[in-house]
C-alpha cells in the first residue's frame, strides 16, 4: 500500500528517476495556513548539501501545490503536492538492469514485480521517495502546533560513533545549528571524519537517530490494535533502511528490575503525571502526556563502489557488480528528517481520531 493513516491520510507516489515525487494529503481541516515555502523549508532540512558525499545529487526542491490550498489557506479538500525530479542521471543504472544490488530492495522488487519494476536510482524504493513523506510532515507539524505539540530529532550514532553526553529537548533542537544535528561536539567531529573515511573507501555507513515529540496530549491511542507506539513503529519502518527500534529507554529498561523500571506517578500543577519518563511517554499503547522519545537504527547504504556478488537475472548466472553512480555515503541524516515527518503524520492522525482537532469545520483564526 502507498497510503498511510485513517483520518489524516497520505498517499505517496513517484520514483527516484521519474518526472516527480508527490503526495496527496487528506483530512486537513479548512483554514490552516499553508504555502509552498512551508513545504520547501522542511525539504531543505533533508538536503545536507554542505557535506557533498551525503547528497551528491543535491537537487533544488521545486515544489508545487496543485490542489487543496487557496490564497495561503487549506480548503478542507485533498492537498496534492508534487516535487519535480530535475538532476536525474539514469545512465549509471543501465549496466545494473536485471542485476540487483546486494542489500537493496532491487532483489525483492524483482521477485514481486518481475522485469517491470523501475530500478533507476532505486525506483520506488529510493530514499528520494521520502521527500513526499517530508512534504506531508510539513503539513502534519502545523496540525500538531494547533495542539501545542512539536517534533524534533537528532543523530545518536553514525558509523559506530555514539554520542556520550547528557542533553535536553532544547539541546536536540539547537543541534540543528551544527553541520549535522548531533548534541555531542566530540562525537560530531568523529562522525564527520567517519563520513569522509567511508567516501574515500567507496563504502557506506549506517547509524541511529532519536526522535522526540513534546506537548502531545494524554489519551491518544487505543488499547490494542490502535496503539500509538505500534502505529509510530509501523510508520518508522516505512522509511527505507530502517532495521531496529528502541522505545523510551528500550533495551536498557529490559535489563532493570521492575522496581527500577517503573516510572513513579506523582502530582504536578494539580494533575497526575509521571515523576520520571523511562517508558517514553506511552503506557498501554496510550499517551500519558510526558514526552515521547524513541530511537531507530538504519543500515548502511547498499550502493557502494566495491565489487559485490549478485546474479544476472536475465541469464540466471552469478556475476559481480561495482556501482559507479552517485550515492549517499550515509542515509542516516536524511532518514532522520523523514522519521520526524512520519512521526508528525502519525500523531496528527491520532489527534484527528481523538477529536482533539476537528476536520468537519474550519479552524478558528
Curated annotation (Swiss-Prot):
Cofactor note: Reduced FMN (FMNH(2)).
Protein name from the UniProt record: Chorismate synthase
This protein's encoding gene: aroC
Catalysed reaction, written as an equation: 5-O-(1-carboxyvinyl)-3-phosphoshikimate = chorismate + phosphate
Top EC class for this record: lyase
Catalytic activity, EC: 4.2.3.5
Assigned keywords, A-Z: Amino-acid biosynthesis, Aromatic amino acid biosynthesis, FAD, Flavoprotein, FMN, Lyase, NADP
Sequence positions that bind NADP(+): 46
One Pfam family in the UniProt entry: Chorismate_synt
Family to which this protein belongs: Belongs to the chorismate synthase family.
Region forming the signal peptide: none
GO molecular function: chorismate synthase activity; FMN binding
Residues engaged in binding FMN: 124-126, 284, 299-303, 326
A GO BP entry: aromatic amino acid family biosynthetic process
Function as written in the Swiss-Prot or TrEMBL entry: This reaction introduces a second double bond into the aromatic ring system.
Cofactor: FMNH2
InterPro entries on file: Chorismate_synth (IPR000453), Chorismate_synth_AroC_sf (IPR035904), Chorismate_synthase_CS (IPR020541)
Associated pathway: Metabolic intermediate biosynthesis; chorismate biosynthesis; chorismate from D-erythrose 4-phosphate and phosphoenolpyruvate: step 7/7
Gene3D superfamilies the record matches: Chorismate synthase AroC
